[in-house]
Amino acid sequence: MNRTDELRTARIESLVTPAELALRYPVTPGVATHVTDSRRRIEKILNGEDKRLLVIIGPCSIHDLTAAMEYATRLQSLRNQYQSRLEIVMRTYFEKPRTVVGWKGLISDPDLNGSYRVNHGLELARKLLLQVNELGVPTATEFLDMVTGQFIADLISWGAIGARTTESQIHREMASALSCPVGFKNGTDGNTRIAVDAIRAARASHMFLSPDKNGQMTIYQTSGNPYGHIIMRGGKKPNYHADDIAAACDTLHEFDLPEHLVVDFSHGNCQKQHRRQLEVCEDICQQIRNGSTAIAGIMAESFLREGTQKIVGGQPLTYGQSITDPCLGWEDTERLVEKLASAVDTRF
């Protein structure tokens, strides 16, 4: 009989289960309390109960655990310095959506060479998240793959659904199940309505099919996530200006949703010129000083060293520099955070 299935499958390998990985890298009581408390603080900011600003900042993607931990240690110092004005959360992105092809992140390809040692990538990701949370720094990530979240979601304080997946039904259903607040980016064309629709969908109960922590295929029924919000990330043109934010809030108001959002300084808002994140910061700070309460948080891409680099076989990588989108360096990061804290002073 002719085969009719898996005709294009090149490789199948056993995957560790989320339960097995959690046994190897368990959540400690201290980390569990830290994650729970961090989520609650973020929820209060998104609801307008806390006047502080949510600051989600870090490398475009994680590829080097040593550099990531050095960044986290420095970020913890900034958290301590500005905790009365800012809720600083580290961007820990392990999955990268690609427009066509490219490196898809630490979990998929931890060795950066196309070997796809996913089990090792999952171990590295969970290990790093535990270490960063143990420092006292909350973590944020994008939930891209429908299975990967099962391995790390218990260590995440804030999640994102990206511009390419906000319109996806299954991602909206997944967001309705997540235990952390979830931001939905506007579409790559700048369309914010799809993010509003995603927020509405994620608030509802859904049923979807998914493996559980033990790898058993199950039917999941969710209760809905009340902490969805828009991430203004720009599109063909920036959308961080006051009139753009007002228009987004009008749409939120139309559907009786909280008029609080997050502004992404990078991506379409900086028109892929990483130093323009500083210009976006200046504009957002002025809006805050002018009395804007809609801006609940910001996102920015920064690392130890400015810019980006390409992966070249046989050549060492520059320590602390991005291998995906270009990032601000550490000195600019300190200046950016200081400016945000100063602007938020006017809310008190």
Curated annotation (Swiss-Prot):
Disulfide bonds: none annotated. GO terms for cellular component: cytoplasm. Keywords: Amino-acid biosynthesis, Aromatic amino acid biosynthesis, Transferase. One of its GO terms (molecular function) is 3-deoxy-7-phosphoheptulonate synthase activity. InterPro entries: Aldolase_TIM, DAHP1/KDSA, DAHP_synth_1. One of its GO terms (biological process) is amino acid biosynthetic process. This is Phospho-2-dehydro-3-deoxyheptonate aldolase, Trp-sensitive. Stereospecific condensation of phosphoenolpyruvate (PEP) and D-erythrose-4-phosphate (E4P) giving rise to 3-deoxy-D-arabino-heptulosonate-7-phosphate (DAHP). It comes from the Bacteria. It holds the Pfam family DAHP_synth_1.
